[in-house]
């Protein structure tokens, strides 16, 4: 049975991964988060804590779903955003490489400029427009630099358990005859359940 550490297990994707693989005969999930009752506390911004935990667990893989995802709050909490979105992935990368684990890092389309008229592809030029995108890109760069065996997945408009754009639109459509939203954004809603598979 392959052991997989899932960081950020209380987020939309982390919960979807747990639903998908909790009863698997092939994988044993080790769920981590901060401030979540019933799961192992792991502060990915603390390199010593990460190294100790990963060396003890000796996982086959680490799936990093942990992130500071509140885009507006990132603009006000720049240091916290950088620690979680950039240094956290760096720490996980170093630890994964030390124990020979694969690292799957979840990133975002916010690493691109917001002016595309067609869907993005992985080779498009990155040009983040805010703190959230810049810190996620810094995290990607650390993963590339420090993780020997890694995958970076850029997702957008994730929806699943929890707050998200799709649920907000459905709720507003039920209670309002008219819903006003920005019309200058292009995105692809992504099912957390499908991504977890």
Where are these regions (language model features)?
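Conserved catalytic-core motifs of eukaryotic protein kinase domains, centered on the activation segment
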Residues: 72-79, 114-118, 163
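Rossmann-fold cofactor-recognition segment
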Residues: 34-48
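NAD(P)H-binding glycine-rich loop region in Rossmannoid oxidoreductase-like domains
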Residues: 44-84
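Catalytic helix-loop patch of NAD(P)-dependent Rossmann-fold dehydrogenases
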Residues: 83, 87-91, 111-153, 157-158
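NAD(P)-cofactor binding segment of oxidoreductase domains
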Residues: 76-104
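N-terminal Rossmann NAD(P)H-binding glycine-rich loop of SDR-like oxidoreductase domains
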Residues: 2-24
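SDR active-site strand-loop-helix element
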Residues: 7, 32, 62-66, 103-108, ...
């Amino acid at each position: 049975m392959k052991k997989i550490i899932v960081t950020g297990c209380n987020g939309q994707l982390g919960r979807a991964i747990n639903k998908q693989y909790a009863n698997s005969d092939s994988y044993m999930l080790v769920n981590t988060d901060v401030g979540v009752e019933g799961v192992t506390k792991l502060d990915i911004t603390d390199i010593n804590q990460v190294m100790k935990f990963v060396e003890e667990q000796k996982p086959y893989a680490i799936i990093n779903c942990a992130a500071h995802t509140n885009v507006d709050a990132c603009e006000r909490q720049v240091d916290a955003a950088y620690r979680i979105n950039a240094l956290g992935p760096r720490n996980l990368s170093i630890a994964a490489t030390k124990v020979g684990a694969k690292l799957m890092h979840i990133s975002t389309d916010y690493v691109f400029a917001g002016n595309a008229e067609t869907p993005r592809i992985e080779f498009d030029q990155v040009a983040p427009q805010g703190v959230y995108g810049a810190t996620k890109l810094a995290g990607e760069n650390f993963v590339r630099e420090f993780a020997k065996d890694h995958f970076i997945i850029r997702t957008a408009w994730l929806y699943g358990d929890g707050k998200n754009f799709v649920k907000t639109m459905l709720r507003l459509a039920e209670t309002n005859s008219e819903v006003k939203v920005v019309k200058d954004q292009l995105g692809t809603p992504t099912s957390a359940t499908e991504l977890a598979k």
